[in-house]
């Protein structure tokens, strides 16, 4: 180990590198959180340009259209667990050990065994990608019954249901839903999420959000009388965006807060009038053993070889 990296050509990180630590004329790999034009990292991107830095963002490394390096599965695994944990803490119905206190993923799953899930724990999960797939693993481990979106309205008792884009978006003029059209240009679509809201209590947001797309639910929606959701685990964690209750990111040490819809402000997590919110933005860090092993394997399999074989698979 050495602190002086001036003789290195390529530097690997994970999260954003502090601007003051960027070394000019190097190649950096890290999650920059800039490619969606996130305003809070504009200075970081500008610094890379000014310092002649080649920035390679893990989010954009793909093979055959699929990302080769990602933590999404682990964000989903922990995010769904934290949602279940937060619900239990807010309503005092059961207690779960924090994920970061578990030895590994299996230990986390073991915490879910033997829980007597309350009948009013009715869960919606949005998304079908890596994040949502991780959340599904946790929900399956919980033993809570899964039902189809079509069964939600008439179902009694505890359940979870996974919604894909055709469930929570619809065209804004009544024309048939077109998945390819939605992904290419979502401007002709609007949220259809509210048709499920009266029948659910916990919402787990595991979708990918395009900034051009409609919000899933708005602050006005959250004020409606039939808005029955009382807890939101926002794994995607787009601040002040598609999930109206996410006012800020939370931390592993302090993962929960409350959102008072009537006043559109943050309040205590245990406020009886508040929607509970879990919005930790570095969820994979709660399972460092599993996440690090997976990340390292993906780097060694896909990225490191590309630096030496002329990038024959056009990953870089």
Model-derived regions, located:
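A structured beta-alpha segment of the ubiquitous adenosine-cofactor-binding alpha/beta core
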Residues: 1-8, 16-17, 163-227, 262, ...
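Solvent-exposed alpha-helices and their adjacent loops that cap or buttress functional pockets
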Residues: 3-5, 20-23, 47, 114-118, ...
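General beta-strand structural signal in soluble alpha/beta enzymes
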Residues: 3-6, 12-13, 55-58, 125, ...
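ADP-ribose/adenylate-binding Rossmann-like module
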Residues: 24-56, 202-262
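Adenosine-phosphate binding glycine-rich loop
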Residues: 54-111, 231, 236-316
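Glycine-rich phosphate/diphosphate-binding loop of Rossmann-like nucleotide-binding domains
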Residues: 95-199
């Amino acid at each position: 180990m050495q602190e002086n990296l001036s003789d290195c050509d390529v530097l690997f990180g994970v999260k954003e590198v502090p601007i003051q630590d960027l070394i000019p004329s190097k190649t950096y790999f890290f999650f920059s959180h800039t490619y969606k034009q996130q305003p809070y990292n504009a200075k970081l991107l500008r610094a890379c340009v000014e310092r002649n830095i080649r920035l390679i963002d893990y989010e954009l490394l793909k093979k055959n259209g699929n990302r080769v390096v990602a933590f999404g599965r682990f964000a989903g695994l922990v995010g769904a667990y934290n949602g279940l944990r937060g619900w239990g803490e807010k309503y005092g119905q059961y207690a779960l050990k924090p994920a970061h206190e578990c030895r590994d993923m299996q230990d986390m799953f073991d915490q879910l065994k033997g829980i007597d899930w309350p009948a009013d724990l009715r869960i919606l999960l949005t998304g079908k990608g890596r994040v949502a797939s991780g959340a599904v693993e946790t929900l399956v481990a919980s033993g809570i019954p899964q039902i189809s979106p079509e069964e939600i309205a008439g179902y009694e008792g505890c359940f979870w249901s996974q919604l894909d884009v055709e469930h929570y978006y619809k065209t804004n003029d009544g024309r048939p839903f077109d998945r390819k059209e939605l992904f290419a240009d979502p401007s002709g679509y609007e949220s259809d999420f509210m048709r499920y809201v009266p029948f659910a209590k916990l919402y787990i947001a595991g979708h990918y959000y395009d900034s051009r797309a409609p919000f899933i639910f708005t602050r006005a929606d959250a004020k409606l009388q039939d808005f029955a959701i009382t807890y939101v685990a926002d794994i995607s964690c787009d601040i002040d965006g598609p999930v109206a209750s996410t006012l800020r990111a939370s931390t592993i040490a302090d993962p929960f807060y409350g959102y008072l819809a009537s006043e559109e402000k943050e309040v205590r997590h245990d406020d009886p009038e508040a929607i509970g919110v879990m919005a930790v933005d570095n969820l994979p860090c709660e399972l460092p053993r599993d996440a690090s092993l997976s990340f390292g394997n993906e780097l060694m399999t896909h990225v490191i070889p590309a630096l030496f074989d002329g990038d024959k698979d056009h990953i870089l």
